From Swiss-Prot:
Tissues expressed in: Expressed in the inflorescence meristem and intercalary meristem. Expressed in the bract primordia of primary and secondary rachis branches.
Domain of life: Eukaryota
Protein's name according to its UniProt entry: Guanine nucleotide-binding protein subunit gamma 4
Residue ranges occupied by any G protein gamma domain in the UniProt entry: 24-107
Location(s), subcellular: Nucleus; Cell membrane
Length: 426
């Protein structure tokens, strides 16, 4: 009863014991350090190889092989050393464009690597030339010969015989142009212009049309393919009319005697041109009864180009131009190039003889320098000037607006008033 109760202490957590490196953190850190050293070594080798000459690259590879084979890295395992050195050779060979099988044969790092095909052939020297020889196509295939090695033509132009071998950048000097400047293989950049025989072959390759001349020579048989209007062929009686294919294809000039009358094919198909007196106007068109009996008084516009009504020209020979026959559907009669005083066609609506805007009844007609705006009789119907008359009607300038404040424009020689070309704005 008198014994005292024993008080037990609460258990305290103990620190965990030191376990070994189960996660392998220290081992991974060691591998990272090894890889960093290897990367630094590769960077130094690359920096050295970039500055090396192409001739000394093979010697550099041999030195690297000896260095890697003799001085081993103590941190790299022995089993992985050969594999990584061979992988280093493969990477360097890809950068330097070197046959990998040749390197494998030299270093003997892989037992499966065989002697490459480029060392077995007898023409291994052709791979070093800029253009592969035709007999080296078997041994120079693959990485030893570039695909576009045949882009350069030989001086004897033997490869220019086939179009597939002669590329567009052919720069052969071709002493014998018969083999180089062929139609199927000669290129524009081929320098074959110094030999006379080359011009013949080039002329046969690139034929120039006979009408690439300043004037067409009608004595040649291919004259009618020319489209120059200044061509006048043999047998053409009308000097103003070109032969078929050389100017006016719609005009047949065979036996045309009268220039004022249209020949066969030029407007009057049923009217003969011999004398131009035996043909009546009714033969040209039935509704041309109002024309005179002379065939030449009825214009070729009676053939239907004027449309509804017949063009009535009382006397065709009073027109100064030789052919007053070009009519259009827009105009009733168009005397192209004729003077209105000589040509008696009733051009009362619209006419080509008045070279202004008066005959078109536009509001700007009174600003033009024509006889219509000067109060003289013209081809227009009525009086076209609705604005005031010019201050100097006797002057030939035809000025409408004149003001003393105007400083630009022309001055009349008599009154010396300045002309406001765009209207008086005062």
């Amino acid at each position: 009863m008198g014994e005292e109760a024993v008080v037990m202490e609460a258990p305290r957590p103990k620190s965990p014991p030191r376990y070994p490196d189960l996660c392998g953190r220290r081992r991974m850190q060691l591998e990272v350090q090894i890889l960093s050293r290897e990367i630094t070594f590769l960077k130094d080798e690359l920096h050295f190889l970039e500055g090396a000459q192409p001739v000394s690259r093979s010697g550099c590879i041999k030195e690297i092989n000896e260095f890697v084979g003799t001085k081993h890295d103590p941190l790299i395992p022995t089993k992985r050393r050969r594999h990584r050195s061979c992988r280093l050779f493969r990477w360097i060979g890809s950068k330097l464009c070197i046959c990998i099988s040749c390197l494998c044969y030299c270093c003997k790092c892989s037992p499966k690597c065989k002697r490459p095909r480029c060392l077995n052939c007898s023409c291994s020297s052709c791979c070093d030339e800029p253009c592969c020889k035709p007999n080296c196509s078997a041994c120079c295939a693959g990485s030893c010969c570039s695909p576009d090695c045949c882009s350069c033509c030989k001086p004897n132009c033997s490869c220019c015989k086939t179009p597939s071998c002669c590329k567009p950048n052919c720069s052969c000097s071709c002493p014998s142009c018969s083999s180089c400047c062929d139609t199927s293989c000669c290129k524009p950049s081929c320098t074959c212009f110094n030999i006379f025989s080359c011009f013949k072959s080039l002329y046969s390759c690139f034929k120039i049309p006979s009408c690439f001349k300043s004037q067409c020579n009608c004595s040649s048989p291919n004259c009618c393919t020319c489209t120059l209007p200044s061509c006048s062929c043999k047998g053409c009686a009308c000097p103003s009319c070109g032969c078929n294919g050389c100017g006016c294809p719609s005009c047949g000039c065979n036996g045309c005697g009268c220039p004022s009358c249209g020949c066969n094919g030029c407007g009057l198909p049923s009217c003969g041109c011999n004398g131009c007196g035996s043909c009546s106007c009714a033969q040209c068109k039935p509704d041309c009864g109002s024309c005179s009996t002379n065939c030449c008084s009825c214009k070729p516009s009676c053939n239907g180009c004027c449309g509804e009504q017949c063009c009535r020209c009382a006397d065709c020979f009073s027109c100064s131009c030789p052919r007053c026959s070009s009519c259009f559907n827009i105009f009733k009669c168009s005397c192209a190039g004729c003077c209105s005083s000589l040509c008696k066609c009733p051009c009362t609506t619209q006419c080509f003889s008045c070279q202004s805007s008066c005959c078109k009844r536009q509001p700007s007609c009174c600003k033009c320098q024509s006889s219509c705006c000067e109060g003289q009789p013209s081809c227009c119907e009525g009086h076209c000037c609705s604005l005031p008359k010019p201050s100097c009607p006797e002057c030939s300038c035809g000025c409408v607006w004149s003001c003393k404040n105007c400083t630009e424009g022309c001055r009349c020689p008599r009154c010396r008033n300045p002309c406001c070309l765009s209207g008086c704005l005062c």
